């Protein structure tokens, strides 16, 4: 009791002190009345937390943590859970980009997305729909400028690209994604989604942009793309195989992929590729590639 009250009395509300207070305010091994004293102290000094995503993210993680454990003896009660949720609402950033930035993290601490209730596919779909809703809001409020800013600041570029594509793949949207100079992972997310949902439009974009390499390598390798690359001028073909990722491939292209990677001097990547194939338990003949 004395230690907790000393913490409250001496708190200078620096970032480190606030983190300590948040931990104490939800510590399951403390009596509820002591947690309440810390919670009241935080609520009385809320301006120190306002607009800081660091604390917003911390509170979201705690809400997620306790929502998953609602039936546990050590879980905080409904009143304390409501305190956390109300605190989060009160300190959210006013800036729309900062307020939505957390939705583009690699992991979304949202209690509605509990893994234990869903398989991985459904979990992934829920996360994507959550991000798409944020993209729609940003576009509605501030247009392409909002998408540009969230793309620049997002943690998970690939998932951001997927959300952009799920939102819309109109030609103005495609031109925006291509011309902004975004991260390659964002391009990969966007164009993999486009290729899987509208191949005809993907190929039209490839032709419109004169077989630009970043559009081609964004979807990795597959049989259809590999055949197309073979029709390109030698310099363009070499550029593709020098830069394409070995982490995105299809089983039907493994031989030609290994062969072409060796031709451009990527023997280390070939070994990495074959190790992953072997680890996956696939029986795929790749010996011809080493005889090229």
Question: What do these predicted ranges mean?
Answer:
Residues 1-292:
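Non-catalytic all-alpha helical scaffold/repeat segments
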């Amino acid at each position: 009791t004395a230690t907790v009250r000393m913490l409250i009395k001496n708190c200078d509300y620096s970032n480190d002190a606030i983190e300590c207070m948040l931990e104490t305010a939800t510590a399951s091994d403390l009596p509820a009345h002591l947690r309440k004293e810390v919670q009241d102290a935080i609520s009385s000094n809320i301006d120190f937390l306002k607009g800081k995503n660091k604390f917003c993210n911390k509170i979201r993680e705690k809400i997620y943590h306790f929502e998953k454990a609602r039936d546990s003896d050590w879980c905080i009660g409904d009143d304390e859970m409501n305190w956390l949720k109300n605190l989060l609402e009160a300190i959210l950033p006013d800036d729309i980009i900062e307020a939505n930035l957390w939705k583009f993290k690699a992991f979304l601490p949202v209690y509605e997305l509990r893994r234990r209730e869903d398989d991985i596919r459904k979990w992934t779909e829920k996360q994507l729909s959550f991000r798409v809703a944020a993209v729609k809001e940003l576009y509605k409020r501030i247009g392409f400028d909002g998408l540009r800013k969230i793309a620049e600041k997002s943690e998970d570029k690939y998932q951001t690209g997927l959300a952009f594509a799920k939102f819309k793949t109109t030609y103005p949207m495609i031109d925006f994604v291509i011309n902004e100079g975004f991260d390659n992972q964002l391009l990969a997310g966007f164009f993999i989604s486009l290729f899987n949902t509208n191949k005809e439009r993907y190929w039209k974009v490839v032709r419109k942009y004169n077989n630009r390499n970043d559009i081609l390598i964004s979807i990795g390798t597959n049989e259809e793309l590999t055949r197309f690359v073979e029709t390109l001028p030698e310099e363009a073909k070499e550029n593709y195989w020098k830069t394409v990722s070995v982490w995105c491939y299809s089983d039907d292209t493994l031989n030609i992929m290994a062969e072409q990677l060796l031709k451009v001097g990527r023997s280390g990547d070939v070994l990495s590729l074959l190790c992953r194939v072997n680890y996956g338990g696939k029986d795929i003949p790749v010996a011809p590639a080493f005889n090229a």
